[in-house]
Amino acid sequence: MTDFSPREIVSELDRFIVGQADAKRAVAIALRNRWRRLQLEGSLREEVLPKNILMIGPTGVGKTEIARRLAKLAGAPFLKVEATKFTEVGYVGRDVEQIIRDLVEVAIAQVREKKRKDVQARAQVAAEERVLDALVGPGSGPATRDSFRKKLRAGELNDKEIEIETQAGSGSPMFEIPGMPGAQIGAVSLGDIFGKMGGRTKKRRLTVADSHEILVNEEADKLLDTDQLVQEAIAAVENNGIVFLDEIDKICVRDGRSGGEVSREGVQRDLLPLIEGTTVSTKHGAVKTEHILFIASGAFHIAKPSDLLPELQGRLPIRVELNALSRDDMRRILTEPEASLIKQYVALMKTEGVTLDFSDDAIDALADVAVAVNSTVENIGARRLQTVMERVLDEISFVAPDRHGETFQVDADYVKTNVGDLAKNTDLSRFIL
């Protein structure tokens, strides 16, 4: 779990996301509160529940991007899911408890990766012995093995092909158990039922270099205590887990609609106990959800937050509104983030030996076109910039391999030549931009 202060979290998010200070502050405080709770003792720690967040804002303003960046910062089990993928329990499709099962799998992978590093040195030695067995045979003498070991460490044998036995992947047949709700639970792997079948292995031919990582990971896993690893992962989910529920506005039931709504109101009802706190059964054990932080987000351009079930609204107490992007925001998005669009295109063209040079007026023109099309066609926020950039650089991208060593100057006139008329013609821009 990260111990960044809210100010540090916000400044980290600022490196990649323009504006939306309120949303950044809300998630930064929520993340810091996770750390604060863990510093408390005994019963008080159990009483402090996370303050779940509802982010409201038009499409393309940074809601999902905030979640992506937060996942990397959190250092905690983090899962992003779309609310539209779930159906009410008892119907075909995934039920919401699958969210927690997936979160446990994420946590197990995280803990395993961390623990592998602790046994890395011993695993390297064991993996080296397995490579030597494949090269010179298990019964070879010490002198031969030492000679090959020196060559192996010097990298002289990297391209040599060897045959090794590796653990068979999770390719066990899957089948449905009738009557079990939700396709994801119903599909059970034979490997899960009968264990690992005595550790099935398969032979593979690989180069020495390619086999290294596979063998090191296998040897590291042999040194790990799986039961302890799973317990740690479940504890991490229960205390630090974060779930980002995207597109929550799409499961609102709007006035005048009637019918079963198994993937709308039914899903909202199923989410209630999950967010409030319940115990979910997974194949690794029971998981309590009281202290998992839920961050929900939606555009709410047709439905309103008040269209959510009142009980669900109450379980998302912190509301954050994200603003639509202005022309100035568009301009900043093109230039300021560490991996801004312009930096990406310059780097891509550099691989062809072509230099792209954007003038300031070109950046203004790109922002103007994006804002103009957003206002006349459909406002899709910053995503419009990608469409405009692709259109502007279409010709350069196509001819770049034949123009090695050349410099292309992109200015306002170049932008207008390529997209200016399209932006003005609303009927055309509906289909092209």
From Swiss-Prot:
Disulfide bonds: none
Chief subcellular location: cytoplasm
GO cellular component assignments: HslUV protease complex
GO molecular function, one term: ATP hydrolysis activity
Single GO biological process annotation from the record: proteolysis involved in protein catabolic process
Top-rank taxon, per record: Bacteria
Keywords associated with the record: ATP-binding, Chaperone, Cytoplasm, Nucleotide-binding, Stress response
Subunit details: A double ring-shaped homohexamer of HslV is capped on each side by a ring-shaped HslU homohexamer. The assembly of the HslU/HslV complex is dependent on binding of ATP.
Family: Belongs to the ClpX chaperone family. HslU subfamily.
Functional note: ATPase subunit of a proteasome-like degradation complex; this subunit has chaperone activity. The binding of ATP and its subsequent hydrolysis by HslU are essential for unfolding of protein substrates subsequently hydrolyzed by HslV. HslU recognizes the N-terminal part of its protein substrates and unfolds these before they are guided to HslV for hydrolysis.
Protein name per its UniProtKB record: ATP-dependent protease ATPase subunit HslU
Originating species: Rhodopseudomonas palustris (strain TIE-1)
